[in-house]
A protein has these predicted regions:
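Flexible, glycine/threonine- and acidic-rich loop/arm segments that mediate assembly and lattice contacts
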Residues: 1-57, 61, 107, 161-194
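Feature targets compositionally biased, intrinsically disordered low-complexity regions
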Residues: 19, 56, 65, 79, ...
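Generic detector of leucine side chains in alpha-helical contexts
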Residues: 44-51, 65, 74-77, 84, ...
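Extended, solvent-exposed, turn-rich assembly/linker loops in the middle of proteins
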Residues: 54-122
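Sequence/fold signature of self-assembling virion shell proteins
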Residues: 112-194
Length: 194
């Protein structure tokens, strides 16, 4: 199913008392937890993959285009991406705080429910990018056409512990691929106004 992709698995669990809830209800709760957390888990895996050099079908690590003001960084990514790849497909990945700043000053705009850069590329606001402590300053990434494949959710069974709790674990495997070498840039740290 994930031939040529870099697969990874996301897990979720639900713990409860064995009395008062059926196994089907516990399974539904565990699957609901998985659904709620899987998008951030996929974002985080993509970002960590960029940091550690995991290959997602293209160059392992992003080419660093330099440090710029946030608005200039967006322009550099748009221009650099078209210069390097030229196919006009892909996405720009920014943290929510950086995306909010870009949206507030009109550098990105919402079109049909999604954010778009002036170069026409979709902009994805990533909570995972804001939450990575290893980033000293906001970083912006441009990836080629990106595909995420999700497998079915699997139930790993019910475990009843010695304290009379029941835990149901579910998992789903994902694969991520993009079609060209990623590029990135960083901006000075965003500090809140006093």
């Amino acid at each position: 199913m994930f031939d040529g992709w870099a697969p990874f698995t996301v897990y979720a669990y639900y713990s409860c008392s064995p009395a008062g809830i059926t196994e089907e209800e516990a399974r539904a709760a565990a699957e609901g937890t998985l659904t709620a957390k899987q998008s951030m888990a996929v974002e985080l895996e993509m970002l960590l993959g960029l940091l550690r050099g995991a290959s997602y079908g293209a160059q392992a690590q992003a080419t660093d285009l330099g440090n710029f003001a946030v608005v200039d960084a967006l322009a550099v990514l748009c221009g650099g991406y078209h210069q390097l790849n030229g196919d006009g497909q892909g996405l720009i990945l920014v943290g929510i705080s950086t995306g909010t700043l870009l949206a507030t000053n009109g550098s990105i705009e919402r079109v049909s429910g999604r954010f778009v850069a002036p170069c026409g590329c979709p902009v994805v606001l990533s909570a995972a990018l804001d939450n990575l402590a290893s980033f000293p300053a906001p970083e912006l990434y441009h990836l080629g056409a990106t595909k995420v494949m999700a497998g079915p959710a699997f139930d790993l069974g019910v475990h009843v512990s010695s304290v009379n709790d029941r835990t149901l674990i579910v998992e789903r495997t994902f694969g991520v691929a993009w079609t060209c070498d990623p590029v990135m840039t960083s901006a000075p740290a965003i500090t809140p106004a006093v």
